[in-house]
Amino acid sequence: MKNINPTQTQAWQALEAHFAANKETRLKDLFAQDPKRFDKFSLTFGGDILVDYSKNLITEETLKLLVDLAKETDLRSAIDAMFNGEKINMTEGRSVLHVALRNRSDRPIECDGKDVMPEVNAVLAKMKGFCEKIISGEWKGYTGKAIQHVVNIGIGGSDLGPVMITEALRPYKNHLQMHFVSNVDGTHIAETLKEIDAETTLFLVASKTFTTQETMTNALTARDWFIKIAGDKAHVAKHFAALSTNGKAVAEFGIDTDNMFEFWDWVGGRYSSWSAIGMPIALSVGFDNFEALLQGAFEMDMHFATASYEQNVPVLLALIGLWYNNFHGAESEAILPYDQYMHRFPAYFQQGNMESNGKYVDRNGNPVDHQTGPIIWGEPGTNGQHAFYQLIHQGTKLIPCDFLAPAISHNPIGDHHPKLLANFFAQTEALAFGKSKEQVEAEFLAAGKTLEQVEDLVPFKVFEGNRPTNSILFKSLTPKTLGALIAMYEHKIFVQGAIWNIFSFDQWGVELGKQLANKILPELNTAEAVTSHDCSTNGLINTWKAWKA
């Protein structure tokens, strides 16, 4: 990867001039000028995902300049470097090869001169065998009963991805009851233990190092609870499995290392659902559906690696997002899935994007002179319409939005889905074109009101419009489609980080708080007043000590 400051490129300067010259661009005018705008500014991927980006504040010239920026910052070399296993996570000296985890071809993928695919496929085969035993009931617990409950204990990438995907694929779910524990708050594990019984529960402890504080605290609590009921530590081996690389620690915990499923240091946490960390997904929906998830991601990988920038879905989404972030001054993006099964999708990419691109130091080690990662947030529709859409429609902040929806529902009850999609289609139209003062007045007149009666109310019912959106419509939410959608957003994040000249695959920002927490924890176990911090932190700790005494 070349370390190029994007603001110093000719394309960036051209984009600044282009923005200044087109600040008054109106979507209403762009559509009026070009009846074929939808055809020009939409793409279909794989025949079952439509990406309509026509309701954006862009012209063909805008896209040309954005593509020029990608070329001038040498995006191609960054893409090739990732797929070729180069150590593009330079601050940790690691390759970034989540694409290898879903490589469904015979193509070798090398890391440090070694093809990683034999090991990847061996772990997948081991996962498949384990899943089949658990799902079929062949695997028995310590009393001879089959497993009915699976509790995944992890945090961050070891939790958010499996939770989001198992929720999204609930229509494909088997009889196993899935539970997820992540928070070190004892309430999370306590409430989960109330829902299960020891005889029929399998615990998955998901920690690469088997030292993650939150995960191991919860795992030890679960183990102690289990042993107290089972009466014999030896029974742990039948009820606990590890998703880890630390065989010594796994064995010391009491887990049979035959039931340890490894992954590698080139797998980043927020990109790990494709690895052994995806075990709860495979257990929930079956291994065939897990493989379909991988297949969808693989097909998006191949599209991303080979399509021209002008026809490349992740690249176009990244460039359009960059246009708003760096030239329009937008500080956030909303992800709005009109599918209840996808209710954790925004939270998943909140981590995926903000942990990847929330950086203020460039790849040369210097402070950046431009904006980097946006704030990502969102909720499912139509709930969000009754919560925060007011600000998107009539607030003072520009918030580009991605709307996602399936054409076909897994639950075609009455007219629920047509009503849902009517709102999906209506929102992007309303955001783009708004409602003028003249339209508002005409509505009042049609309702029998005089303008004198309503003139004070008219300004409040005007919608400026010109609020940009992408519409991502897919035929149905299948494992394969979900895999493609996840990979699409992953690559969007990568493209933006590459152009911004930052490292997207480390996360040093999570470390300082953990270090200070490790320093503070022993102080909480003494009765003495604390004086070792600033006056605010001292005051908070000492108040806590007084209140808990």
Curated annotation (Swiss-Prot):
Keyword vocabulary terms for this entry: Cytoplasm, Gluconeogenesis, Glycolysis, Isomerase
Keyword check for Lipid biosynthesis: no
Subcellular location: Cytoplasm
GO molecular function list: carbohydrate derivative binding; glucose-6-phosphate isomerase activity; monosaccharide binding
UniProt xrefs under PROSITE patterns: P_GLUCOSE_ISOMERASE_1, P_GLUCOSE_ISOMERASE_2, P_GLUCOSE_ISOMERASE_3
CDD domains to which the protein is assigned, alphabetical: SIS_PGI_1 (cd05015), SIS_PGI_2 (cd05016)
Enzyme Commission numbers on file: 5.3.1.9
This protein's GO CC annotations: cytosol
Gene3D superfamilies: 1.10.1390.10, Glucose-6-phosphate isomerase like protein, domain 1 (3.40.50.10490)
Active site: 355 (proton donor), 386, 514
Keyword Cytoplasm among UniProt keywords: yes
Catalytic activity: alpha-D-glucose 6-phosphate = beta-D-fructose 6-phosphate
GO BP, one annotated term: glucose 6-phosphate metabolic process
InterPro entries (alphabetical): G6P_Isomerase, G6P_Isomerase_C, Phosphoglucose_isomerase_CS, SIS_dom_sf, SIS_PGI_1, SIS_PGI_2
Pfam families according to UniProt: PGI
Family classification: Belongs to the GPI family.
Protein's job: Catalyzes the reversible isomerization of glucose-6-phosphate to fructose-6-phosphate.
HAMAP family given in the database record: G6P_isomerase
Name of the protein: Glucose-6-phosphate isomerase
Organism of derivation: Aeromonas salmonicida (strain A449)
Taxonomic lineage from the root: Bacteria, Pseudomonadati, Pseudomonadota, Gammaproteobacteria, Aeromonadales
